[in-house]
Amino acid sequence: MGLLVSSGGGDYESLKPGRYQAICYKIVDVGTRMESFKGGPEKKRTLVYLYWEVSHIQMGNDGEEFWDEITMSDGRPFSISKKYTASLNENATLHLDLKSWRGKPFTAEQLKSFDIENLLGKTCELEVIGYQKQDGSEGVAVESVYKPDGGVKNVSTINDKEAFDLDLYKQEFTGESNEDTKRMLDIYYDLPDWMKDLIDNSIEMKAVDTDSYVVDSKPNDSGGLSDLAKDDDENIPF
């Protein structure tokens, strides 16, 4: 399910359903957990979130379509994300969205060496749809990701480009602290609380003794994400 990202809690401005130009600026690996699908047996599922900042909305006038710049009322870009199972199996949603984003299928060799961090700074088009939340309120979600007109480009972003690598973050608690693990801590502390909870309750973090690790304040500013799962049984759409 896609979700809007805000810098804090409370109210936020929402995108409306439509077609948007966007740039990937953040990737977050929230780890593995046991989950069941439609009452089936539980299985391990590793989740990753892709974040995009939105720059333009597709508009129409007298049958002519054009792109209009869009920002929130304070001038910041809208931000939206989508949750994926970290699998490149051909039936996995991540694989399908990446293929649509690229505009062509992957070769077997490309799948073996795909680095998800290469998505940072890459342009795309997003199809955003509306849906009704469980509490009855209206929300929006990323339905599809497409190759933009003119092809995918690597561009600068307004938000910092960053990737949260859980494997690196975990090393901070296993006596392997270094500049990269400190950088993961910085990213972690800026994540929303619900996402921190996902990370803290992951199988990876539950296997680490974090009780003796005490941080009095956010660390000063000082790898790549874990390999994507090649799970042949991964075919759960979301």
Give short role names for the model-derived ranges.
Residues 1-238:
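Short beta-rich binding modules
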